[in-house]
Amino acid sequence: MMKLVLFGIIVILFSMIGSIHGSDPPGNYPLNTYGNKYACTILGENDFCQKICKVHGVQYGYCFNSRCWCEYLEEKDVNIWDAVKRHCKNTILYPKGK
């Protein structure tokens, strides 16, 4: 009986540790000029997805399920044209600001 109680306590503690750790950060798949997700071949962290995510206005991204995934990418910046308008610092293209 004591072993069963001890086992139950251990299970509860491990489940609490998992819930304290939290869930995955929110994010999105960025879309290119044709409205498609960016394909990638090297799963996990790679330079290509990092660059794509920076163009879309976020700092971190990686290859997940053969597509670039950007953490904390908001819905308004998923499309490349919307992201460029919002994050481009080029005063020739946007002389009066955004």
UniProtKB/Swiss-Prot annotation:
Coiled coil segments of this chain: none
PROSITE patterns assigned: LCN_CSAB
Compartment list: Secreted
Top-rank taxon, per record: Eukaryota
Signal peptide: 1-22
Keyword Secreted: yes
Main location, first listed in the record: secreted
Any one annotated GO CC term: extracellular region
Family matches, as InterPro entries: LCN-type_CS_alpha_beta_dom, Scorpion_toxin-like_sf, Scorpion_toxinL/defensin
Pfam family, one: Toxin_3
Intrachain disulfide bonds: 40-63, 49-68, 53-70
Modified residues (Lysine amide): 96
Summary of subunit composition and partner proteins: Monomer (edited version) and heterodimer (non-edited version) of this alpha chain and a beta chain (AC B8XGZ8).
Protein name: Lipolysis-activating peptide 1-alpha chain
Source organism (scientific name): Buthus israelis
Lineage, highest ranks first: Eukaryota, Metazoa, Ecdysozoa, Arthropoda, Chelicerata
